[in-house]
Amino acid sequence: MNEKLQKVLARAGHGSRRELEALIKSGRVSVNGIVAKLGERLEDEQAVVRIDGHVVSVKAQEEVICRVLAYYKPEGELCTRHDPEGRRTVFDRLPKIRGSRWISVGRLDANTSGLLLFTTDGELANRLMHPSRQVEREYLVRVFGEVNEHKVRNLVNGVELDDGLARFEDVVYTGGEGMNHTFYVVINEGRNREVRRLWESQDCTVSRLKRVRYGDIYLDKKLPRGGWMELELKDVNYLRELVELRPEKETMIELNNSSRKRDRARSQKIRRAVKRHEERVSTPKGRSNNAARRKPSKADGQTNKTNSRNQAGSRSKPQR
């Protein structure tokens, strides 16, 4: 073994490379009692590696099945594992697993909702996030401001932002009234607030932003906000093949999951779990659950894969 420490730890399932690089930079990782440095290579697989003082394995989990969740992130949740102020995070509602942990594939701003993928495979997460892979992300965005042919052309051709040139791969107009306009936009990287900053460069303010697609994985219209579903084997392998990883042969869920009755029961189960979570986090101390009970927000309809792509031709585009 002679590889960079963050790569070894990512393959062992302790996080994505970016997450682990941040941990190493902050001095939270040690090797044989010595604080590790970014770029350090691990040559001995018997070395004692600690993260936050806890000994962790550096052996690749070859026999652990790669799992992927599709989560419908609501507005207001933070993409972090722990928040010192006690605010909700995207990890709060995910199912508990033994011997591994969920790793988020990228991030969404607190005020952005929609599809967020999680996986148990750190290498898969890292490759999907890396700009060199050019994995498409599609968003439904509502903007306030004057939008014309010239501005749309700028967004497609490219705009110089603080961190370099950025552009939309596609901009599709879906309607609007007055100064409010709704578009589907596609980008192939995940820079911080990139969609919002692109529109701001054209003097338009984003009033609503929702991710509806990552690669060819679409936000399921049956999924409520705050709900999750585990991807089937074919979808997991689509993501793995997209970034040149070997396909999986097993899955943790049933292969035959097409029954309407089963789908309906699963959807109801997810909704009940979301409701219980909402009641728990919204109950002030000293008050009963019944006194603080409120209804969870209804999931708004979302265009699925068929509607998003097959109806693309029916969306009227502004003249470029």
From Swiss-Prot:
EC number(s) from the headed UniProt entry: 5.4.99.22
Keywords, in A-Z order: Isomerase, RNA-binding, rRNA processing
List of catalytic residues: 109 (nucleophile)
InterPro entries reported for this sequence: PsdUridine_synth_cat_dom_sf, PsdUridine_synth_RsuA/RluA, PsdUridine_synth_RsuA/RluB/E/F, PsdUridine_synth_RsuA/RluB_CS, RsuA_PseudoU_synthase, S4_RNA-bd, S4_RNA-bd_sf
Domain of life: Bacteria
Function text: Responsible for synthesis of pseudouridine from uracil-2605 in 23S ribosomal RNA.
Family annotation (PANTHER family): PSEUDOURIDINE SYNTHASE FAMILY PROTEIN-RELATED, RIBOSOMAL LARGE SUBUNIT PSEUDOURIDINE SYNTHASE B
Protein name, per record: Ribosomal large subunit pseudouridine synthase B
Lineage: Bacteria, Pseudomonadati, Pseudomonadota, Gammaproteobacteria, Vibrionales
